[in-house]
Amino acid sequence: MKRKLFLCTLAGSAAGLVFGDPVSDFLASAVREPHPGRVGLAEVGQVRALARMFARQDHGFVGGLSAEAVVTQLSVSANLLDGRFSYEAVRLQLFSAMAELADVAAGMCFDAGAHGQAQQCFQFAVGCATEAGDWAMRAKALSGLANLAVHGGQRDDALSMAEMALVRADRLPPVTRAVMYTRHARALGLNGVHREPDCLAATDQAEQHFAAGTGDEPSWMAYYTCAHLERDIGRALLHLAVNGGDPTKAQARLQAAVTSFPAKPSRGKTLAIANLAHVTMSRDDPAHAAVLGHTALDAMATVRSDRVFAALRQVRVAGQRHSRIAAVAELNQRLDGALPGTVIS
């Protein structure tokens, strides 16, 4: 089976991530329902609709309850994979739809701070997409694993997953390919200033492919705009900036992202503001960083995201050495009250 061959290769490239056959593993732990019988295009459509409903919810108010709901639905829907199919094409479409739902579930778990569950769902998405021959979704789920590894500071795993996402990049449409290069750039940036030339080359590739976009992308990529590209490039450069690299490039990208996002608070915009506050606090202007930090905190009334929390914790750590500045001291105090586990003495 091509899925198992691919996953064996994947397992050998990711030291910290345990890959067996994630489809079989997930099904073994899924909520078991009566045998689904015959599965057709109607069921495939229902799974796609669920994925898109939860994706819309994910772009709104995200939290632990939403993540629990989508994982439960994924577990129940996974039973359809044991059904009977009149045509092989229907079976492959179901695996593709299940990969989309699993990827959404993984992202929501990641954002809720449930990292173990996020990893399991991303791996399930990789397995389903590989079985379906859905190269774009396979790359997206692998890039999710790369982001998860970056978040955990797992440099080797981040780079392995990001590079695996770019295998046969020629099969990916331009904007999807651009996103994969931003994930690769971020993993390279995490690996240190000595990888700066490679990181910058990856960001250049991302810009070139994004500019070549024709609109012929998977529906789940429709959300991705120039603002997201600027933010993702800025986040890749952030790792370099706070470790001795040039901060101005990261600041310019993140500021462009903040300006390009709609005025309404959103997770993407708030994350860009928090990242901009981090690099600014770390390198050159703590007073302005404090203003940015307050702006990000204000947005948390409507944006709940563990990833934003993590970015603000980095602002708090960077702000500790500037605590004699009144504006920074005020921000530090507010961060200590707003973010669990961030009190720093």
For each predicted feature, which ranges?
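Conserved binding/catalytic microenvironments
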Residues: 34-345
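Compositionally biased, long intrinsically disordered regions
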Residues: 1-44
